[in-house]
Swiss-Prot record:
Function description: Catalyzes two activities which are involved in the cyclic version of arginine biosynthesis: the synthesis of N-acetylglutamate from glutamate and acetyl-CoA as the acetyl donor, and of ornithine by transacetylation between N(2)-acetylornithine and glutamate.
NCBIfam families documented for this protein: ArgJ (TIGR00120), PRK05388.1 (NF003802)
Complex and partners: Heterotetramer of two alpha and two beta chains.
Transmembrane regions listed in the UniProt entry: none
GO CC list: cytoplasm
Name of the gene: argJ
Keyword Amino-acid biosynthesis assigned: yes
Organism in which the protein naturally occurs: Corynebacterium glutamicum (strain ATCC 13032 / DSM 20300 / JCM 1318 / BCRC 11384 / CCUG 27702 / LMG 3730 / NBRC 12168 / NCIMB 10025 / NRRL B-2784 / 534)
Statement: the UniProt record of this protein carries the keyword Membrane: no
Cellular localization per UniProt: Cytoplasm
Entries under Gene3D superfamilies matching the protein: ArgJ beta chain, C-terminal domain, L-amino peptidase D-ALA esterase/amidase
Pathway: Amino-acid biosynthesis; L-arginine biosynthesis; L-ornithine and N-acetyl-L-glutamate from L-glutamate and N(2)-acetyl-L-ornithine (cyclic): step 1/1; Amino-acid biosynthesis; L-arginine biosynthesis; N(2)-acetyl-L-ornithine from L-glutamate: step 1/4
Biological processes per GO annotation: L-arginine biosynthetic process; ornithine biosynthetic process
Protein name, as recorded: Arginine biosynthesis bifunctional protein ArgJ
Amino acid sequence: MAEKGITAPKGFVASATTAGIKASGNPDMALVVNQGPEFSAAAVFTRNRVFAAPVKVSRENVADGQIRAVLYNAGNANACNGLQGEKDARESVSHLAQNLGLEDSDIGVCSTGLIGELLPMDKLNAGIDQLTAEGALGDNGAAAAKAIMTTDTVDKETVVFADGWTVGGMGKGVGMMAPSLATMLVCLTTDASVTQEMAQIALANATAVTFDTLDIDGSTSTNDTVFLLASGASGITPTQDELNDAVYAACSDIAAKLQADAEGVTKRVAVTVVGTTNNEQAINAARTVARDNLFKCAMFGSDPNWGRVLAAVGMADADMEPEKISVFFNGQAVCLDSTGAPGAREVDLSGADIDVRIDLGTSGEGQATVRTTDLSFSYVEINSAYSS
């Protein structure tokens, strides 16, 4: 049993292979299988109204609360491919179901990569045969985590040990990240014995305060998907609060890894807003700052430019006292009552982690934190050549 990742909990096996979908020749397909005895499943998906074919198929299949296997491919998003894209997604599901002796409705499917290119179905189906070949499925969570990478530089795994039961997970995604998950595919597994309702509550609560508050570049993917699969193999049923805590811890860890590996990242930035009417307004204000390119450029340059913070937050749909706003960088006041504080320009932001705190001055109880990164030369270079 693995020390971390999707095969750390009891009842799960995985496989990975190189099907030739990625131009790099790196591994590009993975499979996660729940061996039971239970098969509860929960999921959350992108809120982008232009969503990929695998999202449509997975939404349909998880609707009954059970998923027994999830198929992943990297290098091709199978998004914006019309009816052919949906046909291909369903064909891959049927092929896998037949190989595993399952129903089509037991299968989740996830794709990531370039938008607008048809899947090479000959390679995909051959890859499915490799993933399900005799001896392929086993304690291969680490290999699966590597196979789903696209522009990621490192694989992302996690594990949370509870009282006799475990939550494991893997994720990918470094760009096109904005609330509504973040361009990412995440698979969480647990050997706890839980109902679909318990799993969905835990997953929805966790993603709302982890992945949904990760905003790298303001772009929301067509393919975002997070699955939580429960095998019940531990024989232990946690309370809802215990499950919530473990799933949150797993999501938080993966979200931190996504932020740390964001495309071109040199700074990991947390933007916290307080002093507005409610949490919804606070998160709107934090996102407004986190998405502001001038602010992000200042972070790249280690420049404590509080004026850019004020200019950005002033555009937010949040209650504020425009003449009473305060800004703190790494705990040091740089702006008080919307005016520069002594020593503001001397604040040292040369470290990799920057904490920005903004008080909107209303004395309201709203507060929220959004995690983002700087805007570097490397980010532009990576994304200017993504389809070439």
